[in-house]
Amino acid sequence: MQDTFQRQINYLRIAITDRCNLRCRYCMPATGVPLKGHEDILRLEEIATLARVAAGTGISRIRLTGGEPLVRKNVVTLVRELAAIPGLEEISLTTNGIFLGALAFSLKEAGLKRVNISLDTLKKDRYRYITRRGNITSVWQGIRAALAAGLTPVKLNVVITRGFNDDEILDFARLAREEPLHIRFIELMPIGTAAASGTAYVPAEEIKGRISRVYPLEPFPDLATNGPAANFRLVGGRGSVGFITPMSNHFCSRCNRLRLTADGKLRPCLYWDGEIDIKGPLRAGAPETELAAIFARAVSLKPAEHHMENGWRQPRAMSQIGG
């Protein structure tokens, strides 16, 4: 599909649940966020149907998100069904890694290609603080299992916040040098509870500068996966570092994605309030041609770019939208 700005839209991010086993401070309050009722959430067979329709419109890549997607029952079955859909070239998943150790090999066997794991600190106590309940040992078990299962390249998503974990930038770079891991530093965005954290923002150029003064960097185009990161190899290292810059140097001109929320809404842009209901027509028995037209309408509504730098704020938590 092509939008009104001649961008090819071939990537669908599907939030398969709004539930999460953690309460990360920049994502949601300690009490969590209001959850949708069971009937409000797309059923697995509905997700598979919409994925099949999306593939028919030109979607070739799907990423499963949440919430935390691995808390969804029968997620392995869902992956297997999605992997069997003609036209879908890649199924990937973003997770906090807590349950990945137990599921990595089953997910790989079902057809999952690779994983991104959210990890904002390498320190046990700090991890517990930021997640309010997590155990970093479980995350490392998940990382090792993902590598062993071949869910590669394994990428670690790191949101850097000033005064909290910016002292670990070089620690993460060292990890990428010593291990076959790909660290993606992501600029803090004004979404959910992070909307009130303006002073915590650290631009990617500052992060890159700190790293390059210690570890020489060279462009790493081999890791290109049609995503927004600018990737670099640490000379002599086993992994890489990448920088995702939604604030300082947005990548809207090459955006190729749609989002499907857990409650069945299509979002043309993460940073836009507009949503299009597709669950309602699906449950009302709409034919697949009508559902395909709804996908096409969502694509036609994609804005040219976001407006976060102009003070726009997303009131919904990332777990509600689908990160």
From Swiss-Prot:
Residue positions binding [4Fe-4S] cluster 1 = C20, C24, C27
Cofactors that this protein relies on: [4Fe-4S] cluster
Stretches assigned to the Radical SAM core domain: 4-226
Pfam families to which the protein is assigned, alphabetical: Fer4_12, Mob_synth_C, Radical_SAM
Catalytic activity, as annotated: GTP + AH2 + S-adenosyl-L-methionine = (8S)-3',8-cyclo-7,8-dihydroguanosine 5'-triphosphate + 5'-deoxyadenosine + L-methionine + A + H(+)
Per UniProt, the enzyme's principal EC class comes to lyase
Q: What is said about its interaction partners and assembly?
A: Monomer and homodimer.
Family note: Belongs to the radical SAM superfamily. MoaA family.
Q: What is this protein called?
A: GTP 3',8-cyclase
Q: What gene codes for this chain?
A: moaA
